[in-house]
Regions:
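Glycan-recognition and catalytic cores of secretory/periplasmic carbohydrate-active enzymes
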Residues: 31-38, 116, 150-541
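Electrostatic cytochrome c docking/interface patches
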Residues: 37-59, 176-180
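N-terminal secretory signal peptides that target proteins for export/translocation
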Residues: 1-12
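Non-catalytic, surface beta->alpha helical segment in thiol-disulfide oxidoreductase systems
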Residues: 116, 122-156
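Thioredoxin-like thiol-disulfide oxidoreductase module
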Residues: 49-52, 85-131
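Catalytic cores of eukaryotic secretory-pathway lumenal/extracellular enzymes that build
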Residues: 69, 99-101, 266, 393
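Bacterial N-terminal signal peptides
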Residues: 19-30
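Local sequence-structure signature of Cys/Sec-based thiol-disulfide redox active-site neighborhoods
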Residues: 49-83
């Protein structure tokens, strides 16, 4: 029988409780190497799907470090803690250490239900979960933790760590029109009721822009729902522009740690910013605002300049955080190097960015933006049609694609090329989408459950994550229309049916939410419901 006990003393509990303030919140294929850790004093194993099985003979517990190149606090942990000799020596002697780049190994991040980065997972020597937490601990505090872990681990043992929200779910046995109609209503009401009436934004903890969710609120529901959403979102985006927006170069930062939008995390992501630009143009269309137009235009210029590589012909994904640079005015910034723009391009991030930008160009009608979008589509298309399988990411310095793509890559690519086919009235893009969809069905579709499953996560893994990816694929298949065969039509209905009872989990999710990014997963599936219902009802008419 496993023994469960508290890992750390009361003082250490306080340290770990507040460490979240240092979290950066979610054929032959070349194997890419994660960034920076090769020179570390800590001897890290490179992550692979079988790294645990291959190293169990050592009998040591595992230290899994989830990190990201764009994350300020990840670099802080590496530079301030892992460079301490007694920490590195202890880890090397008593642990098998595994470094996991969360962008390359995104499915492993989902598998362990990690929250933010850096994120630490300790496994027992048998590979079972012992303890996990998010954030940065410094030298001696971290050393105390790893010593206690080393002394306490054992087969089946656990310690009280961060409690990751797990949504338990029994799939619907049959399709119910009532469930399909009630789910979006419950979602909209729950989200609208949880806007912060004093500081704005969703919830009363950390604050961020949620483009999918906010756009969905503006475009769905009753007239009264949309009017209420407009009021909340206008105030929310005004606060975002005041607090997490870069007025000099454009672009919005990833999120703010506090309810009142303080302590920004200064990473800039392409998909977040493309979605935010679309949101601002949409808000301005409904209720004109010079402030929104200025922020949207400036951020779009940032995307089409700083985050566009004209040599590669595609958009880049990330500009890393810098806690000093963004306090400088325009003149002083010219005297220093700007934060690095990452030279890796991830398939799903690029696809999500382009999906937004296609719609953005309907507002701005900019030939330059259209050319950049088309070139980026060609960049992805070349990988899809010339390679033997979808790849996870492209390394600009090596001009090589690395790692097999996961379900997220396939789903985002199918959805993108269906959108492109419709927008540009180009059947070739529909052919590309069909190619990726066929490969998705062969690689990820589970006939028993009737949904697409990421093997690393499993059908009983993160149900909200899988719901979103299934929602993207369902939307794309509906978009294929007459090009979809009878088998594809059956898959759509099975996917919609499987997740149709997820609305029952909403009350608990709304009650204790801290990070509201989970809503982004729901709206993808809800959009699929809307499309499915429209086609079903029209066919019956």
């Amino acid at each position: 029988m496993s023994k469960s006990f508290s890992l750390i003393s009361n003082r250490r509990k306080d340290i770990v409780r507040w460490v979240a303030l240092g979290v950066c919140l979610t054929g032959l294929v070349p194997v890419g190497l994660a960034y920076e850790h090769n020179a570390s004093l800590v001897h890290f194993e490179e992550y692979s799907d079988n790294v645990i099985a291959q190293t169990q003979e050592s009998g040591k517990p595992y230290f899994l470090l989830f990190s990201a190149e764009w994350c300020h606090w990840c670099h802080e942990f590496s530079q301030q803690t892992l460079t301490q000799k007694d920490v590195a020596d202890y880890l090397n002697q008593h642990f098998t250490n595994v470094f996991i780049d969360v962008d390359i190994h995104d499915t492993t991040y989902v598998k362990y239900r990690a929250l933010g980065v850096p994120f630490t997972v300790f496994l027992n020597p048998d590979g079972s979960l012992y303890y996990k937490y998010g954030g940065t601990l410094y030298g001696d505090d971290f050393l105390d933790v790893i010593k206690e872990v080393s002394a306490s681990v054992g087969p089946g043992k656990t310690a009280f760590g961060i409690e990751t929200r797990v949504v338990s779910y029994e799939p619907s046995p049959g399709l119910s029109i009532d469930n399909l109609l009630n789910f979006p209503v419950a979602f909209r009401r729950g989200v609208l009721d949880n806007f912060d009436s004093e500081e704005y934004g969703l919830g009363r903890e950390q604050k961020s822009i949620l483009p999918r969710t906010f756009l969905y609120l503006l475009e769905s529901g009753t007239d009264d729902d949309q009017k209420e959403a407009l009021g909340w979102l206008t105030k929310t985006m005004e606060r975002a522009i005041e607090t997490i927006y870069d007025p000099v170069e454009g672009g919005f930062f990833r999120y703010a740690e506090t309810r009142d939008w303080r302590v920004p995390h200064y990473e800039k992501f392409s998909d977040l910013n493309a979605g935010t630009v679309l949101l601002l143009y949409r808000l301005n269309e409904i209720k004109p605002s010079p402030r929104f137009i200025e922020a949207a235009d400036t951020t779009l210029r940032y995307l089409t300049s700083t985050l566009y590589d004209s040599d590669l012909g595609c958009f880049l994904n990330f500009q890393v955080a810098d806690t000093n640079y963004y306090f400088l005015n325009e003149k002083r910034r010219k005297a220093v190097n700007p934060p690095k723009v990452m030279d890796k391009i991830f398939s799903d991030r690029l696809a999500a960015t382009l999906n937004y930008l296609i719609e953005v160009n309907e507002y701005v009608n900019d030939p330059k933006l259209e050319e950049q979008v088309i070139r980026s589509l060609g960049f992805l298309e070349q990988m899809i049609l010339q390679g033997q399988e979808i790849r996870r990411y492209f390394s600009a310095p090596e001009h090589l694609w690395y790692e097999p793509g996961g379900l997220s890559d396939y789903a985002h690519l199918v959805h993108l090329f269906i959108r492109a086919a419709s927008h540009f009235e180009n059947l070739h893009y529909a052919d590309v989408a069909s190619t990726v969809l066929h490969a998705s069905i062969l690689k990820f579709y589970d006939k028993n459950s009737g949904v697409f499953v990421e093997p690393a996560v499993g059908s009983n893994g993160n149900v909200e994550y899988l719901m979103a990816l299934n929602g993207l694929l369902a939307q794309a298949m509906i978009g294929l229309g007459d090009r979809l065969d009878e088998k594809g039509q059956s898959i759509i209905e099975r996917v919609i049916t499987y997740y149709s009872l997820m609305g029952e989990a909403l009350e608990d999710r709304f009650w204790d939410a801290v990070d509201w990014h989970f809503t982004e997963n729901y709206v993808v599936y809800l959009a699929a419901i809307d499309q499915f219902a429209a086609t079903e009802f029209s066919s019956r008419d």
